[in-house]
Amino acid sequence: MSEKEGMSEELEDTISQFRKESRSQSVKEPGFIKETSNLINEASDYLEGKSSNQIYETHPRQITLESTSSSGSKSKRNEEQKKNLQFSETSTRTETSQSLSSLTGRIAEYQALVNFLSHETVGEVSPQVSEENQKHLGLETTCKDNFTVNLEAKGLQEFPKDILKIKYVKHLYLDKNQIKTFQGADSGDLLGLEILSLQENGLSSLPSEIQLLHNLRILNVSHNHISHIPKEISQLGNIRQLFFYNNYIENFPSDLECLGNLEILSLGKNKLRHIPDTLPSLKYLRVLNLEYNQLTIFPKALCFLPKLISLDLTGNLISSLPKEIRELKNLETLLLDHNKLTFLAVEIFQLLKIKELQLADNKLEVISHKIENFRELRILILDKNLLKNIPEKICCCAMLECLTLSDNKLTELPKNIHKLNNLRKLHVNRNNMVKITDSISHLNNICSLEFSGNIIAGIPIEIKNCQKIIKIELNYNKIMYFPLGLCALDSLYYLSVNGNYISEIPADISFSKQLLHLELSENKLLIFSEHFCSLINLKYLDLGKNQIKKIPASISNMISLHVLILCCNKFETFPRELCTLENLRVLDLSENQLQKISSDICNLKRIQKLNFSSNQFIHFPIELCQLQSLEQLNISQIKGRKLTRLPGELSNMTQLKELDISNNAIREIPRNIGELRNLVSLHAYNNQISYIPPSLLSLNDLQQLNLSGNNLTALPSAIYNLFSLKEINFDDNPLLRPPMEICKGKQLYTIARYLQRADERDEKILEKIFKIVANNITETNFEFLCQKLNLANSETDMPTKSTVSLSERAHQALVIWKTQSNKLSLTAAALRDQLIRALTMIGAYEIMDKITALNLFTRAIKF
């Protein structure tokens, strides 16, 4: 095989591996790619009718291993890479497919580089292992050469010795285990390794023996606790890729300069402050990640890496660029977001191959007209700077596809912006734009347009010429009339015009049959327009914060509607017309004036989420209990009439996962709440609840419990049964057991441990009280006490009464009473209080004095 072919194969592995690391690192992919991909995927999901409802998992999903041959694994990776070059699969709608095809083709050129920042599961291929060991490790063998072993998240605490003794193992993935050292790994067993990945293991160092791995091409020890790289790493002459992302490295490992074949180096998210001048010895380095370190200057050494194509310096403290940056002749991607740049050195505009330049969140006030040199530029991110204008010369960047200028001080765009014929994404949110220029209409390939947070009063009718546009956001401007030009956009599926002054909807919107997502909240709408009802493909409609009072019967035509938001309107009665929406999943009628719910709501067979918070219900609307599909219910009343009780029928909603009954005047939780087996979240704060029913403690999937601001004085000891609980809050309760300071940390273990010890203590105190009563009670008071404790004579009479002392009989009677009371789930503390009340009623004051003394003594002892 030629050297060129070998390099190509290694670079292919490089791309695949860098994907794996970068996804686990949560490295952001370029905004244009990510957002546009999400946008198109969302459209695809809409068209395919996919649900986006949240899925709750109480227990982590089990990870299984698959086995294929090495060549099969490589074929699989190649196939997946090809898939990743596409933004989405062909849509079921011809129109959408046509509008997206050009987008896909244009971006394919640099999508391979972007794919460095997206993770793929590495092919899991198993080595030759005995059938017994295969069964034990969950491995299978399908070939006899070039094996990959993937033991990710298997709970391993040391290297799997049996696997290492197999000479054919070449690729070993041990990510997400607890392997903290190389102890137990015989370096001789590792000699054949070409890829070793130990991400997320808690490693604090690398052993010097790593120098023996002469065949190693890829080493990934990202997401560990490594602070030092041993000098022996310089002996890895064949290494192509090194990943040390998210560790504690403070000094750049100078020994890396000996790794002449290194192509990818990731040292992002460490504590580096300096880069050595010897770095240029890495003459084959193509990708360098130094994001989120502590670099205060742009290291000049970086400028002399002749083959560098991607450089990430995001999240440092760099305030200027050196003139030597012009030497990076092959650089295609430069990421400098979140730094301290106040200007750009003019030499940066000599990087003629640059395709992606990200400069968001700096302090740039001006962009040089020399930007015209960037003839290959595809992506330009300039959000969150101090720019007041963009030079006209930007229109010489003929290949530009993504331009984002949000959060600056722009008042207008370049007059000849229409020359950017390839522009697909233009975002100018939160600036000082007064109008959208007519020249926008000549951007024939534009797909995503955002001008939210400006002072725009109208949209030019010529926008109708942008027939490939699929998403528009115009939120929080000064628009008074619905832009008619938008109604002529055949590919528009997402439109958001929240926070404007629109009071009427034109009939022309009826022609926007392709529209899937429409937001018009915080406008001046007085009615639910009949024209909305012609949008038969619409899935999401937000008309919240308007002044709508009723719903037209023709809403039944909106057969695709999944989400309907009508919060903060003027509804006084529940609109029965909504009950014809058989496909509705989410309905928000919060902050209206509803007093009751129609029984027709049972027709919403697919409803999953309801928000009726802050209304005027006289009673809990029991009609809701018919909804078998409901997963989330919010009936909190921070602004509405307070509910005082919950019906037992609440338990009929067996699919319920989230319940919010906060800010009411509810006195008790239904005793059968334990029948809501799927409940994950219960918010009942700011009520008058004084007791937690035992059945609540059987909710095994419960993860969130908020009972703050109630009247709880004690927590049940069995609260530890809620083993899935992750978030708890008992603040602002008059708690005595446990005391409030124990609950402030919101740690279930601390609370449960206290209650366990308190139970043990209360049991001992109760037994001592039994002895005090038995040793001091009179025959007459004993009979009265039995009556007060509801103990029948048959339970206290003994066959040998003449020979059994009063003390023994009294103690036996109290034990019987305790046994009976335990059936009612009464705690030892509650039994003690009940017994004291009974003794007070029969006038056993001498005994009471002794018990009081005992209580005072025990309270003085801290436990």
Swiss-Prot record:
Keyword Repeat set for record: yes
Domain of life of the native organism: Eukaryota
SMART domains, per database record: LRR_BAC (SM00364), LRR_SD22 (SM00365), LRR_TYP (SM00369)
Keyword Mitochondrion: no
Keyword tags: Leucine-rich repeat, Repeat
Residue span of region Disordered: 1-37, 51-100
LRR repeat ranges per the UniProt record: 143-166, 167-189, 190-213, 214-236, 238-259, 260-282, 284-305, 306-328, 329-351, 353-374, 375-397, 398-420, 422-443, 445-466, 468-489, 490-513, 515-535, 536-558, 560-581, 582-604, 606-627, 630-653, 654-676, 678-699, 700-722, 724-745, 856-863
SUPFAM superfamilies found in the cross-reference section: L domain-like
Pfam families xrefs: Death_Lrrd1, LRR_1, LRR_14, LRR_8
Domain Death: 767-855
A GO cellular component entry from the record: cytoplasm
GO term, biological process aspect, one: signal transduction
Bias-annotated ranges (Low complexity): 88-100
Record-given protein name: Leucine-rich repeat and death domain-containing protein 1
